[in-house]
């Protein structure tokens, strides 16, 4: 997204424009990489659908040099920031991740549906996560992320946050059909890089849960 889309404009200008997805199903087989300042807008959940059939996340973050995962921020690259995603469905047809919020600051998801492949009554799967954070460290911490009026359905773990992250908010969201609604801090251990601090200031307000096999929200005692 945004990479080499308009060679007559500066990179900053390209990256700060709204990218509109008309209603339809957009089929991909590898992760959609979201750079700093990206703003994606669809025509509504189950109208604009980005569907990934590959064995990877539907959406991941990248820096302005195109680095992803543990390489985000290398050589002084701008890390993912000021990202907005609105009015669409992010869907995976396999037991993988909806969106991985790696080293991102100031991200806003409004009226987005995260749709996986989990069947009601199924068993847990650590690979099937609607929203997760990986590769976040003390230097590059995921922070200030808002999910507003979003739908999460058919992932074994609709939300799974163990890596360092702060101020992640879910407001007026619907969580449906999963083994866990939200799993918070299950893998943090206080010593491993990225798992030393774990999630902090995670908020759920005015939200609902249904058809959850275990806990709606399970917070690690650590």
What do the PLM-derived regions correspond to, one by one?
Residues 1-39, 43-54, 89-90, 94:
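N-terminal extracellular ligand-recognition/capping segment immediately after the signal peptide
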Residues 12-14, 33, 78, 83, ...:
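Short, surface-exposed loop/turn motifs at beta-strand boundaries within globular domains
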Residues 18, 31, 56-60, 82, ...:
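Structural detector of coil-to-beta-strand junctions
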């Amino acid at each position: 997204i945004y990479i080499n889309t308009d060679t007559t404009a500066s990179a900053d200008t390209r990256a700060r424009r709204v990218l509109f997805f008309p209603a339809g199903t957009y089929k991909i087989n590898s992760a959609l990489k979201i750079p700093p300042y990206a703003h994606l807008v669809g025509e509504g959940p189950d109208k604009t659908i980005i569907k990934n059939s590959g064995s990877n996340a539907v959406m991941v973050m990248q820096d302005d040099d195109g680095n992803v995962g543990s390489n985000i921020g290398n050589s002084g690259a701008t890390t993912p920031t000021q990202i907005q995603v609105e009015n669409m469905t992010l869907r995976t047809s396999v037991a993988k991740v909806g969106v991985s919020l790696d080293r991102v600051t100031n991200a806003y998801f409004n009226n987005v549906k995260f749709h996986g492949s989990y069947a009601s009554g199924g068993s847990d799967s650590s690979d099937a996560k609607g929203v997760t954070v990986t590769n976040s460290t003390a230097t590059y911490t995921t922070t200030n992320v808002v999910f507003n009026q979003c739908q999460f359905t058919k992932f074994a773990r609709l939300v799974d946050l163990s890596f360092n992250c702060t101020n992640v908010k879910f407001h007026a969201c619907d969580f449906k059909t999963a083994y866990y609604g939200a799993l918070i801090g299950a893998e943090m251990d206080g010593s491993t890089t990225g798992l030393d601090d774990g999630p902090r200031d995670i908020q759920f307000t005015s939200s609902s849960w249904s058809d959850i096999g275990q806990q709606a929200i399970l917070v690690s005692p650590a």
